[in-house]
Amino acid sequence: MLRLILVNKAGIGFLCLLSSVSSGQDYGFHQPSDFGSSKLRFPSSQSYYGADFSGFFGGHGGRRPAHQFPSFSGSGYFGGPGFGICDSPIAPCTQGKYRTYDGSCNNLGNPRLGVANSPYGRLLPPKYSDGLQAPPVSVTGHNLTSARQISAILFPDAKAPDPKWTLALMQYGQIITHDMSLAAGTTQGKAHTTMCCTPDLRAALPEDTRNPACFPIDIPDHDPVFSEAGIRCMEFVRTTNDISQGCNSGNKAAEQISAVTHYLDSSNVYGSSQQGADARREFQGGRLSVELKHGRQFPPPNNNKSAVCDHLSEEEACYLTGDIRANQNPQLTVFQILQLREHNRLAGELARINPHWDDERLYQEARKIAIAEHQAVTYYEWLPIILGRENTDRNGLTYNTQDFTYDYKENVDPSVLNDHATAAFRFFHTNIAGFLRLFDEHRSSYEALRLSDHFNRPQIIEEGNNFDDLARGMHTQPQESSDKFFTTEITWFLFRNGRSLGQDLRAIDIQRARDHGLASYNHYREYCGLPKAHSFEDFADLIDPESVQKLSYLYHHPDDVEFTVGGSLEAIVPGTLVGPTFLCIITEQFYRTRVGDRFFFENGVKDTSFTLEQVNEIRRGSISRLICDNADDVKSMQPRGFEQISQDNPVVPCSLIPAPSLEPWREIRQGEHTASQPQAVDHEFTFPFFFKK
């Protein structure tokens, strides 16, 4: 049995907090009913916080339990509907070698699977209070506690840098998220045209006069932060669902819609439609459109700045990319630009070795390679850190091979799971740092940017050497530890746009899960093979007693505890960065994302596959190589960029970071000689850095 030990970042004034909440005044606490007690009993120190997680690391003989990765059945919750809005028509499928932009025709037997503007999948049935789309209530019939109140009590701030991983690990997680999911109808940090609160935020608009999509977050009278500013209401608009779009007659539960493709296909770079992709192309040399500034490539300006940026003047940068969220924070924008530059670098190199290729061929081949590189970094660098290498190997997410994997399964639904996108994959919000440090070429930090000063304001990255110094910075600065603590930059000041206070991302996460009707934490425990909690004390197998005590005051019943809340409080499984239920759901999602994608770079599917030589070159890429090749003037990197610099991971010249060769893409036309061709680099370093044990 593995014993899990969680070391808190800092102590909390829990006795003081309880004295406040027990009166039911300071935070507007309800008095818990049948299951609430201030005298909860916890296991002894010998058994507390210990659990056997062998099932997550091959406890079933190295095979996934049948219930854990169900095949697509075309109906029910295991698989999801997988259709475009109101079954809009799609073009006939052909077995071409390139992906469509909207995700259609990836699965030739069910061409709508994973398309943009289709519903999320689900593992567990929704728990809408009316069975259709009304947000959940307690199993006792009471309203659930305010999402802001839960955030303030359970998820305070306490700074504790991660001892091993860099801030780039968290930031690349946001790139993956934006690639695979975008809740339709949300504005991602910009003011929504639908207003749910009074202009002064002192109250919610009356229900009989406000838009039905409104679901504002109530702020208690004695909130420790917002009440002092007179703020009693936080704006929140529900995600577009199939009922609101007229695709569901209202006789079955609503399913929320994702506006982007469900595949890991760099839609954040290229867009999720033909029109969107064309708007981002130069149509020369296979390149994406850029604006050159002092010889540096940046995305073209967004002509609708007010919709996506909080700029102070029209001269400030605001970029057009494949994703509306690209300007959200400086380090996210840096990664978006690195991906754009990588595409253009690939297109230029392909044009050099294949001068006879036209613009379309160069663009599509560069796009195909860039997507494959993104998949390789995600699966072979990023996921083994998050989920544990043993787990990714045993569950078919990673392979230590120089062959094809031949693991495409057309009966697996690749749709992004609501359970994943709306809860489990928001785990890394705890890893966000409130200040972004800039590092020069010598890895000396000379300045830190306050995160909330730069939400939706990317201008800072164009100034001086900030682009490189932010790129180095996130590969040098530790991320915050994986635990129950969240920086106030996102729980007090999110999207504040110059105001003294902003919004609360943790409260928004909780409210979004309610909006989507996610099942309870207890149900996900059962689904993942953990025992159901019949009392609050039963949660103490995975959650510390202090947090369990708070849960008993915040919720009326153990079945009320929400997945995004309970999962965020769990002890971290050794060798991973998440607790067991999040581990279960994220593993399931990325299994589906891989084996349900006919174009996944390793699977060897006829007509869509790379050659084996090309695949092995792609495997040589890394996040550090992305920086070396595409930053302005970064000359050195540590080989494992998601890992902090150490004696085992020293900073080395970029020339020593393995680089894929594009020689396997050289197309030899009839009559050409090959004797003078450069030789492809050897494969001595085919998994050099990601598989250290």
Where are these regions (language model features)?
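Cleavable N-terminal signal peptides of Sec/SRP-targeted secreted and luminal proteins
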Residues: M1-G24
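N-terminal accessory/cap region of cofactor-dependent oxidoreductases and related radical enzymes
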Residues: S23-R345, E349, E365-A507, Q511, ...
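Mobile, glycine-rich extracellular loop/lid and propeptide segments
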Residues: D359-L362
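Short linear, low-complexity motifs centered on an aromatic residue
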Residues: S535-L554
